[in-house]
Each structure stands twice: as C-alpha cells, then as structure tokens.
C-alpha cells in the first residue's frame, strides 16, 4: 500500500472538495436554501477533529445468535496483525471509541457476521469498518476482495484516506479508487484487493466490463446509506451490485439516520444482521433560556439585534434567516455597523463553507449569519447565542419544531447555558412561536429590547 498511501497523504482536503461541482447552479435559481445530505456529510467529516466529545447511548439489537456479544476496551484484545495495530496507533487512536468497542468484535468475528450500524460522523464508525476491510484481505490472492460503496466521489476519497493511513504499514495490501476520472485497462483484470468508490463506477467495472469477479468479494460495505437513498439512481445500483455477490459475503451497512426508508433499504442488503444504534446526546432545551421579541418589521428586527449587542457582551452567535437575500441584507447592515460577520449560504462552494466555519469556530468572526443550509450535525462548542431572525416553518408555513430544536440546540451544550432569541413581526409569526412553545412545553419569555435593564438580565 506504500505508493498509494503516499499519494493519498499528499492530497490536500481543499483539492478534494474543490472538485465538487457547486459553482454553477443548474435550473431555476431559488432564494431558499436546502441542505444537501452529501455535502453536509462531507463537511462534518472534514471539520471533525478526532472523535466527537459528546455523550453517547448505544442500543444493541442482537439478531444473529452466533454473533459475539462481548465488547473490547483495547485494540490489543482484537488480536490484530502488528502492522495494522501500528497503523491504528499512528492515527492517534489509543483506545476504541464506544461504537468500536461493541462493533469490532462482530466485524472481525470468524465466521464473518453481518451488521447494520446507525451512527453519525465523529463516532469512529469509518475507522471501525476500514479496520474490518483491511483485516479481511488475503494478500496471497491478487483480485478484489472488498467493495466499499460511498454515494459521492468526495466521500469515497475521505474513506480511502482513512484506509491509507490505517494501512500505511500493510505494504502488501493494494487499494484502488473506483470513482470518476479513474480509468482502467479493459484488457486486464483488476488486481487490487480493496475497491472504494461510487455505485455507478463499480457497477461498470464489475458487471458491464467484468474486470473483476463479484462472486469473489468477501466484504461488502455500504456507507452513508441515508445519503445513498437521497442520491438519484444509487439505490437501484446498490441493489444490482448486491445481487451479484456471494451469499456468504460479509455485509456491512452504515447510516447516520434510522428511518423506515433506510431500514427497508438495509433489509434488502443485509441478512441476519447484528444491529447497533449509536446516538449522540440529543439536543436539549434544558440549559437554554428562550425569549421572543416583538418587532414592527425587518428594520425593527435589526434594531432589536443592535440593542442586544449594545447592552450585553455577546460571544459567538449564529443568526438564522429564511432566505439567502435576507442573510445578505443583514450581513451588510451588521458589517457596516462594525460587527465581525461571516455569511454561510448555499451559494458558497464546499471549500468556501469550510473556510467560513473554520474562521467562525476559531473566533475570527463573532457572528455567523446563515440559512437552513447549516443543517444538523455541525457542532460549535463555544456558541452562546442563537437568534432566529426568521422562525423556521415548513412548506405550509407551520412551525417546524424539529428544525427549531436543531437550531437552538447548538447552544446550551456540553453543560453550558445558552440563549435563544426569536424575532416576531406579526400574528402569524407569533402563532408559530406559540406552537413551538406548546410543542416543547418550555416557556418562551417576552423580551423588551428597548429596555436596557431587560436586556442586561438575559446576560446574567
């Protein structure tokens, strides 16, 4: 793996994500932002510095009676090859994460066991299944033995980089990307042990061009299954690949969500699985003080923000707007009044979004103005205040309580207290606010931003 690993190590993240075709928008322009699941997953993976430091709850559903029930507290307990263990430690993993403790004995069991795992990015699940992939390779056989499917080029590259780093001392293991831009000599069979790529490319190589024998695959990994379902065509391609595999092939299925659509998909792919659900600590309103401010219009909303900043010391704050136009208008006004402001909307490329988030997380900008493009899963530990310049509503104009929770749940985390401020302009938005209050059964207090005394109270 030496040459490939060096090549992968030399690639910069910015070069990888820069290949995303996000600069040119096709079709009708819209002022509303919708988070793309593949882009969001990529952002979370790249932004994650090691494992997420949140409380985790694990739900193990044992379906296969032959699957091991024990967990491990050290990597040594897995009896790995010395070269693989060395790679794990070189990556900075000292002890298994919570999902690794439980998943690895099943992933590495002999005979192989199938698994469905629900776990968000930052929990160590990629390292877990990559370890299983590397462990299963028989270097004496010069043909593909492991298939790992990702929904996009960029997510496949991310997985490949993990495999390269973990397998850097396993020099005999050969890995290849099956993604756009990768060409193959159709007169020769593929000899690399591990193929990581997108469904369409792997379908072409394995079935259309018959460059490797699908029946000889011993491990099949389907990663980011929820994103796969959301990507047109991938669902059917995955099923076509699965049908060509040996019934004894180990099937590993990973998803960040656990809805009915995902599980229906999983049941088509995985027989007799051990099911692991690992949930991050849910956003909670317990440590968050919620307020609403009555304003006459958009200018009144801006004046309310100005009054708040004029009376109390606000550290890091996120302001959510309904449209890109409103976000741009608000950013221009706040910047002209001397605030250090960053803007994050769907008009930015992934590279630009990474830069904005890195600058905000490092404190270079104190205010981040965004839309629903900043979806769940991206944590900012030092966040103190969330302002809903526009309350979240669904397509029917009704209160979107789930989005509200994910928005303000970014503050009041890690045992700290937070502040959420909702700006109200009319009876319609007041009803939305009231519906949110009833849904969570948590009082949203009125705040008079024309009173310095009232504002100072929320800062204590």
Swiss-Prot record:
Catalytic activity, as annotated: ATP + H2O = ADP + phosphate + H(+)
InterPro entries, alphabetized: DEAD/DEAH_box_helicase_dom (IPR011545), Helicase_ATP-bd (IPR014001), Helicase_C-like (IPR001650), P-loop_NTPase (IPR027417), RNA_helicase_DEAD_Q_motif (IPR014014)
Matching Gene3D superfamilies: P-loop containing nucleotide triphosphate hydrolases (3.40.50.300)
Main localisation: cytoplasm
EC annotation from Swiss-Prot or TrEMBL: 3.6.4.13
Transmembrane segments annotated in the record for this chain: none
Positions of modified residues (Phosphothreonine): 30
Molecular-function GO term, any one: mRNA binding
Limits of the Helicase C-terminal domain: 287-455
Localization of this protein: Cytoplasm; Nucleus, Nucleoplasm
A GO-annotated cellular component: cytoplasmic stress granule
A single GO BP: regulation of gene expression
Residue window of motif Q motif: 73-101
Function: ATP-dependent RNA helicase involved in mRNA export from the nucleus.
PANTHER family recorded: ATP-DEPENDENT RNA HELICASE DBP3
Protein name in UniProt: DEAD-box helicase Dbp80
Organism encoding this protein: Drosophila melanogaster
The encoding gene: Dbp80
């Amino acid at each position: 793996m030496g040459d490939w690993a060096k090549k992968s190590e030399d690639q910069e993240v910015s070069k990888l994500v820069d290949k995303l075709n996000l600069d040119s928008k096709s079709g009708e322009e819209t002022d509303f932002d919708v988070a793309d699941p593949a882009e969001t997953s990529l952002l979370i993976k790249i932004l994650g510095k090691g494992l997420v430091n949140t409380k985790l709850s694990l739900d193990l559903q044992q379906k296969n009676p032959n699957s091991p029930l024990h967990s491990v507290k050290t990597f040594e307990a897995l009896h790995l090859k010395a070269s693989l263990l060395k790679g794990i430690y070189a990556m900075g993993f000292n002890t298994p994460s919570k999902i690794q403790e439980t998943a690895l004995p099943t992933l590495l069991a002999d005979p192989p066991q199938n698994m469905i795992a629900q776990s968000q990015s930052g929990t160590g699940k990629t390292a877990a299944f990559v370890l299983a992939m590397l462990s299963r390779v028989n270097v004496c056989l010069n043909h593909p033995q492991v298939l790992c499917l990702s929904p996009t080029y960029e997510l496949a590259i991310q997985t490949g980089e993990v495999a390269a780093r973990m397998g850097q001392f396993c020099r005999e293991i050969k890995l290849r990307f099956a993604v756009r831009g990768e060409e193959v000599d159709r007169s020769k069979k593929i000899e690399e042990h591990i193929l990581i790529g997108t469904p369409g490319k792997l379908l072409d190589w394995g079935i259309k061009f018959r460059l490797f024998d699908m029946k000889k695959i011993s491990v099949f990994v389907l990663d980011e299954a929820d994103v796969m379902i959301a990507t047109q065509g991938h669902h059917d391609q995955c099923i076509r690949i699965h049908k060509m595999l040996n019934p004894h092939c180990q099937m590993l299925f990973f998803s960040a969500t656990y809805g009915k659509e995902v599980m229906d998909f999983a049941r088509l792919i995985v027989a007799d699985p051990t099911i692991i659900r690992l949930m991050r600590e849910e956003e909670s309103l317990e440590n968050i003080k919620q307020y609403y401010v009555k304003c006459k219009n958009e200018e009144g909303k801006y004046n309310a923000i100005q009054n708040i900043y004029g009376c109390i010391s606000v550290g890091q704050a996120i302001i959510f707007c309904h449209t890109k136009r409103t976000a741009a208008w608000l950013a221009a006004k706040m910047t002209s009044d001397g605030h250090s402001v960053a803007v994050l909307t769907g008009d930015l490329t992934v590279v630009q979004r990474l830069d904005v988030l890195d600058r905000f997380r490092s404190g270079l900008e104190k205010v981040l103005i965004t839309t629903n493009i900043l979806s769940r899963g991206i944590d900012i530990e030092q966040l103190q205040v969330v302002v809903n310049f526009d309350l979240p509503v669904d397509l029917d104009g009704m209160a979107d309580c789930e989005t509200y929770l994910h928005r303000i749940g970014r503050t009041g985390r890690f045992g700290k207290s937070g502040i959420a401020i909702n700006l109200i302009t009319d009876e319609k938005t007041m009803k939305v606010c009231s519906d949110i209050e009833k849904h969570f059964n948590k009082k949203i207090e009125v705040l008079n931003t024309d009173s310095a005394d009232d504002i100072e109270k929320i800062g204590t």
